[in-house]
């Protein structure tokens, strides 16, 4: 039998005897509309929901709907803000607390909280940091909203950028790029879908890497520790890797049985 894993939210809801509902879609969903209307709630808080809240739902609570969005709005509206921030080598990442309006991520913002982005941070680590930050800040935010103390300021829509959904094929590395951009891509796509290269028809996913000091032709393997040359007389050193169909490995263990050796050329396609 397949076991269905409960989400942490479902688990805590059941423990505390709080209603837990999981509608696949809210659009034209009369049941959920009437459920929420009957609750007569003060405020709705939305985090990483992945669907547009229909306009008719937005009037069902006294103080509207607010969203915790994982970017410094108006930058990186949309589906993959954390990944795009890391890929873009942004100096800061953050969360924005905004009122939900009909257009996606366009509502006025009451507060933005930032953290410095270290360029060895991956998407999983940043997601965890921002989740903790959001959990810490939202309680005061809710109090301010309920007491009419929160000030929501319109976004500058002319400065908006969009964090489009990640496509798996974006993970393929281009050795004609510079080292910082390659590391940014590796970190932004960990753990999913992962940055990768193809060698002799097999896919190798890079889980962790750092900037190296070697110089060579783009795609050339410069050492038996899997240091690979890229553009601008730069290189990256791979620290953890996963061969297609295999478990993740530290690079020392991986290289013992690998057909990738010093002098191998890894192409872009």
Give the ranges of each region predicted by the language model.
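One-carbon transfer enzymes
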Residues: 1-191, 234, 243-245, 262-269
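An anion-binding loop in the catalytic cleft
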Residues: 176-269
């Amino acid at each position: 039998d397949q076991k269905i894993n409960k989400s942490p939210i479902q688990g805590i809801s059941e423990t505390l005897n709080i209603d837990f509902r999981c509608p696949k879609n809210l659009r034209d969903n009369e049941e959920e509309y009437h459920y929420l209307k009957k609750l007569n709630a003060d405020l709705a808080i939305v985090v990483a929901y992945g669907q547009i809240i229909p306009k008719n739902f937005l009037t069902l609570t006294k103080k509207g709907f607010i969203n915790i969005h994982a970017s410094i709005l108006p930058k990186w509206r949309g589906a993959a803000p954390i990944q795009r921030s890391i890929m873009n080598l942004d100096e800061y990442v953050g969360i924005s607390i905004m009122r939900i309006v009909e257009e996606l991520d366009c509502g006025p913002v009451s507060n933005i909280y930032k953290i410095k982005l270290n360029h060895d941070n991956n998407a999983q680590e940043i997601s965890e940091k921002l989740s903790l930050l959001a959990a810490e800040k939202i309680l005061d935010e809710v109090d301010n909203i309920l007491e009419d103390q929160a000030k929501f300021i319109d976004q500058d829509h002319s400065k908006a950028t969009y964090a489009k959904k990640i496509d798996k094929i974006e993970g393929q590395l281009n050795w004609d790029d510079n080292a910082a951009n390659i590391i940014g891509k590796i970190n932004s796509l960990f753990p999913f879908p992962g940055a990768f290269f193809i060698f002799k028809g097999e896919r190798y996913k890079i889980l962790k890497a750092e900037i190296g000091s070697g110089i060579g032709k783009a795609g050339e393997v410069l050492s038996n520790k899997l240091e690979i040359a890229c553009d601008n007389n730069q290189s990256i050193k791979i620290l953890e890797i996963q061969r297609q169909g295999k478990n993740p490995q530290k690079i020392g263990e991986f290289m013992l049985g690998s057909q990738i050796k010093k002098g191998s050329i890894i192409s872009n396609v």
